[in-house]
Regions:
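A conserved regulatory-domain signal marking ACT and ACT-like small-molecule sensing domains
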Residues: 301, 305-386
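Phosphate-binding beta-alpha-beta segment of Rossmann-like dinucleotide-binding domains, i.e.
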Residues: 80-138, 302-303
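Oxidoreductase and adenylate-handling cofactor-binding alpha/beta cores
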Residues: 88-107, 153-160, 285-299, 334-338, ...
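Rossmann-like dinucleotide-binding domain for NAD(H)/NADP(H)
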Residues: 213, 221-313, 357, 368, ...
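Rossmann-like adenosine-cofactor binding region
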Residues: 43-45, 167-260, 275
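N-terminal Rossmann-fold NAD(P) dinucleotide-binding loop
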Residues: 148-149
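Glycine-rich Rossmann-fold phosphate-binding loop(s) that bind the pyrophosphate
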Residues: 144-145
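An N-terminal-biased, well-structured beta-alpha scaffold segment characteristic
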Residues: 1-79, 192, 212-214, 218, ...
């Protein structure tokens, strides 16, 4: 039986995917085999020796020490796309709300309490909140992953002209994207075309300040920008300067900061993107399934620090080896399996940056002695026999 520790409140719908005959889910345990986490800060957490995996019920993993996990042979999973619909719906809602000045208009209405001539005041005051329909306008989508592709498709259905930029678009995302979305190979070519720009890329050193002085200079005057991905993707100083000059007429974001709160034309929401029970359920279910499949079968799906390896079992025992991505590893591993007289039914080896994963299905004397010999190979970090 595997022990699973939960560091946050995890949806019962997800926990139900962990069969109680194979998994013991507990909040208080010092030696878990797996951890389910949402937002708890694990950066300074000391990991027990038998910890095999951490599954994050969400996409971002900046609360998990990835490098240290890799060094200790701990597989880290996330749940890309599980909250995509929740975020996409909010983006479309804010796109419309921002275009029609809904937030500032609703706030103005709160001051009408007790006005004896409210109807006249409303008719007179509504002119200051004049907005625009989005039908026929142009939307630029930066990043066409699970969320960006949904936003693009929905905008097409609402009558917008949509351009998309994503040099790393996956095959699955491309298949799911409407044929009416126009693909741009260069971000600088897309920006001048757009009345609205929405960002849906992960936060990486290469994506920090995607919206900056240079990119803003290329945009249409009066462009509206939506950021429901990561706050750091937009350079705040450049944004505020562009709003003062009228280059940017509106900024809608899920990431409030002291610098932008209270500024005209800026609407902040308190990180509501994935805050729906449906999204929490979806994330928990995906995280639990990933964790279960790895612990029981050694399959790695949606890991952020290890290569993806997903194979049906071919019979016999399964040998799972996490090791450094170095030359000669396969020959060292197979030399030991040959010495042990094993017949390899199936073998997969994949790498991700400096990490690699080798998985073998074999028949014969797969025992503790073999595991110890495999673990003694200098570049091997962890060996499991399932």
């Amino acid at each position: 039986m595997y022990t699973i520790k939960t560091l946050n409140a995890i949806s019962p719908v997800g926990l139900a995917k962990l069969n109680n005959k194979q998994f013991d889910v507990a909040v208080d345990t010092d030696a878990p085999d797996g951890i389910l986490v949402r937002s708890a800060d694990m950066l300074n957490t000391a990991f027990n020796d038998n910890l095999l995996a951490i599954a994050r019920a969400g996409a971002g993993v900046n609360n998990i020490p990835l490098e240290r996990c890799s060094e200790q042979g701990i597989v880290v999973f996330n749940t890309p796309g599980a909250n995509a619909n929740a975020v996409a719906e909010l983006v479309i809602g804010m796109l419309i709300a921002g275009s029609r000045n809904v937030a500032v208009a609703a706030q103005w209405c709160q001051g009408l309490t007790g006005d004896p001539a409210m109807a006249k005041t409303v008719e007179k005051g509504k002119k200051q909140f004049l907005g625009y329909e989005i039908k026929g306008k142009t939307l630029g989508v930066i990043g066409l992953g699970a969320i960006g592709s949904r936003v693009a498709n929905c905008a097409i259905e609402l009558g917008m002209e949509v351009y998309g930029y994503d040099p790393y678009i996956s095959i699955d995302a491309a298949w799911n994207l409407s044929s009416q979305v126009r693909h741009c190979v260069n971000l600088n070519d897309m920006l001048p075309l757009c009345d609205y720009i929405t960002i849906h890329v992960p936060y990486l050193p290469t994506t920090k300040d995607t919206i900056n002085v240079q990119t803003l200079a290329l945009c249409k005057d009066g462009v509206k920008i939506l950021n429901y991905a990561r706050g750091e993707l937009v350079n705040t100083e450049a944004l505020l300067e562009a709003m003062e000059t009228g280059k940017v007429s509106g900024y809608m974001t899920d990431f409030p900061s002291e610098a932008i709160l209270g500024k005209p034309g800026i609407v902040c929401t308190p990180h509501l993107g994935a805050s729906t029970p449906e999204a929490e359920d979806n994330c928990a279910v995906m995280a639990a399934k990933e964790l279960s499949d790895y612990l029981k079968n050694g399959n790695i799906i949606h890991s952020v620090n290890m290569p993806e390896v997903n194979q049906p079992r071919a019979g016999g025992k399964r040998i799972c080896i996490i090791h450094k991505n170095e030359p000669g590893m396969i020959s060292q591993i197979t030399a030991l399996t040959t010495e042990a007289g094993l017949n390899i039914e199936n073998m997969v080896n994949k790498s991700k940056k400096n990490m690699a994963y080798t998985m073998l299905d074999a028949t014969g004397a797969v025992d503790k002695k073999l595991a110890e010999k495999l673990a003694a190979i200098p570049a091997v970090i962890r060996v499991r026999i399932l």
